[in-house]
């Protein structure tokens, strides 16, 4: 979906659809601007008070357009980011299947909310009907934003459109089932991106033999149970820039049965979403390519399928990681940290300025934080603060949880250097502490997106988070190149 900016309202009835955000105090100004002569009577008869998300439809009653909707903002002081998202959903629902383009007057919306509102409009416009025999009737392609005053720039609108493209890719990948989206498929997606942006991207793919040669036995302990071979995929963006890269590492378990420590049947279909960390990395890379942000970034995807078989890892097995540390695998359903730990060791060769891993890692994080914010873990206060700020700016928020040495003893094993689970308490924290043992050589943060990567119920599907957060974080750093 594309945006344009206009400083004045359309003056011709040829604009078939117009939507205006209004407050009760601004109704008279709206009536004058759009020549709605009977608006006082209409609002009185319909009892339209411009309450939040309240909609009034006017057909043939405005001289400037044939079809007009007023959408109430309510009390402006109560307009929080969560309400902005709901407002965007209301607007898209009104027009998505009816119009290819609309004019949307946002003059009544506080200027500081314009960017977030435009971003939310793109998110609300997403449709996934790839496997439906009857396709969606959605057709909205362009929104002409009308406002005399705004902080939005053409560059910001271009970035919003690039974020939407990357977030849509992440959602598409997450929504595709495990029989379509498996490790080799993710590798093909990375190669397709590199083919689309050959001057910006360099892709490298490790197969299982190459991993074995590197001693990546923790990763292979997960993938060996599946007939689908694992892959480690790296995408280097703007490699020519003379700066240490930001490295994004995504967990890409394309389907997680739990392995021998098998999961319950109920809800197991949602384990196709266990690769949403990897999807967010690929989506972020796509956004960077479209926006052409001047920053050196490496995306790394740890792609594997966790299946039970005669070749699968058994609880109690011990493996030696690429780092040389040994791991006792007490639970094969704690597999994400196993594919990540070897990948976190592998990416040291890029001499990163910092590393962020993104993973649907623990149910414990969902218990702690629900499905509103992602879990943030980092021993680096400055890095954590940067991510928190980016989360607030993009309304893709995080909440910091501790990662400290006090928890490390919970991972002690009598037989190996470390166990892959830490007991029944603080599971999200001990998972982060496990990863921390493989990240001592660089600045590092871990995002546990188990609660935010997808929705269940009637709105079931991948969210594409945390693409907005990651892009905002990188955009904020463009001027500093720390």
From Swiss-Prot:
Record's signal peptide: none
Q: Which GO terms describe its cellular component?
A: cytoplasm
EC assignment: the record states 3.4.11.1, 3.4.11.10
Q: Which one GO biological process term can you cite for this protein? A: proteolysis
Q: Which residues form the active site?
A: 263, 337
Which residues take part in binding Mn(2+) 1? Answer: 256, 333, 335
Q: How is the cofactor bound?
A: Binds 2 manganese ions per subunit.
Query: Which Cys-Cys disulphide bridges does the record give?
Result: none
Q: Which co-factors does it depend on? A: Mn(2+)
- Source domain of life: Bacteria
Keywords on this record?
Aminopeptidase, Cytoplasm, Hydrolase, Manganese, Metal-binding, Protease
Catalytic activity, per the record?
Answer: Release of an N-terminal amino acid, Xaa-|-Yaa-, in which Xaa is preferably Leu, but may be other amino acids including Pro although not Arg or Lys, and Yaa may be Pro. Amino acid amides and methyl esters are also readily hydrolyzed, but rates on arylamides are exceedingly low; Release of an N-terminal amino acid, preferentially leucine, but not glutamic or aspartic acids
Q: Which Pfam families does the record match to this protein?
A: Peptidase_M17, Peptidase_M17_N
Q: Where in the cell is it found?
A: Cytoplasm
Any one GO MF term held by the record is: metalloaminopeptidase activity
Indicate which residues the UniProt annotation says bind Mn(2+) 2.
Answer: 251, 256, 274, 335
Among InterPro entries, the record links this protein to: Leucine_aapep/pepB, Macro_dom-like, Peptidase_M17_C, Peptidase_M17_leu_NH2_pept, Peptidase_M17_N
Entry's family note: Belongs to the peptidase M17 family.
Which purpose does this protein serve, as stated in its record? Presumably involved in the processing and regular turnover of intracellular proteins. Catalyzes the removal of unsubstituted N-terminal amino acids from various peptides.
Q: What is this protein called?
A: Probable cytosol aminopeptidase
What species was this sequence derived from? Answer: Acinetobacter baylyi (strain ATCC 33305 / BD413 / ADP1)
What does UniProt list as this organism's lineage? Bacteria, Pseudomonadati, Pseudomonadota, Gammaproteobacteria, Moraxellales
């Amino acid at each position: 979906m594309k945006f344009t900016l206009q400083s004045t309202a359309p003056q011709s009835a040829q604009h078939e659809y117009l939507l205006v955000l209004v407050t009760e105090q601004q109704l008279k100004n709206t009536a004058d601007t759009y020549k709605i002569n009977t608006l006082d009577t209409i609002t009185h008869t319909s009892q339209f008070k411009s309450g939040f998300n309240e909609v009034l439809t006017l057909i043939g009653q405005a001289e400037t357009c044939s079809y007009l909707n007023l959408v109430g903002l309510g009390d402006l002081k109560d307009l929080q980011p969560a309400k902005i998202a709901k407002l965007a959903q209301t607007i898209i629902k009104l027009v998505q299947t009816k119009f290819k383009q609309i004019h949307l007057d946002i003059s009544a919306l506080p200027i500081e909310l314009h960017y977030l509102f435009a971003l939310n409009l793109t998110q609300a416009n997403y449709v996934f009907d790839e496997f439906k025999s009857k396709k969606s009737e959605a057709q909205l392609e362009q929104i002409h934003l009308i406002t005399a005053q705004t902080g939005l720039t053409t560059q910001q609108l271009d970035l919003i459109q690039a974020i939407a493209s990357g977030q849509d890719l992440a959602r598409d990948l997450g929504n595709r089932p495990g029989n379509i989206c498996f490790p080799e498929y993710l590798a093909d997606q990375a190669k397709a991106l590199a083919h689309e942006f050959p001057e910006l991207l360099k892709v490298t793919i490790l197969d299982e033999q190459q991993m074995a040669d590197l001693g990546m036995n923790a990763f292979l302990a997960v993938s060996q149970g599946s007939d689908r071979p694992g892959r480690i995929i790296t995408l280097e963006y703007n490699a020519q820039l003379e700066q240490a890269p930001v490295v994004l590492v995504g967990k890409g378990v394309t389907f997680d049965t739990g392995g021998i420590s098998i999961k319950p049947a109920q809800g197991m279909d949602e384990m196709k979403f266990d690769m949403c960390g990897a999807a967010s990395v690929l989506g972020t890379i796509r956004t960077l390519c479209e926006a052409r942000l001047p920053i050196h970034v490496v995306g790394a995807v740890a792609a594997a399928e966790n299946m039970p078989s005669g070749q699968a890892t058994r609880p109690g097995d011990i493996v030696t990681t690429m780092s040389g540390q040994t791991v006792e695998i007490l639970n094969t359903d704690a597999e994400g940290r196993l594919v990540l730990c070897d990948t976190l060791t592998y990416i040291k060769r890029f001499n990163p300025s910092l590393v962020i891993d993104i993973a649907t890692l623990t149910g414990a994080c969902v218990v702690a934080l629900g499905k509103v914010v992602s879990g943030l873990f980092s021993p680096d206060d400055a890095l954590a603060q940067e991510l928190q700020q980016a989360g607030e700016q993009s309304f893709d928020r995080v909440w910091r949880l501790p990662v400290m040495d006090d928890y490390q003893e919970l991972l002690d094993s009598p037989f190996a250097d470390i166990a892959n689970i830490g007991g029944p308490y603080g599971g999200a924290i001990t998972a982060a502490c496990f990863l921390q043992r493989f990240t001592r050589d660089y600045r590092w943060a871990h995002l546990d997106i188990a609660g935010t990567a997808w929705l269940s119920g009637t709105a079931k599907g991948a969210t594409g988070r945390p693409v907005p957060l990651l892009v905002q974080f990188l955009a904020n750093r463009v001027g500093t190149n720390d």
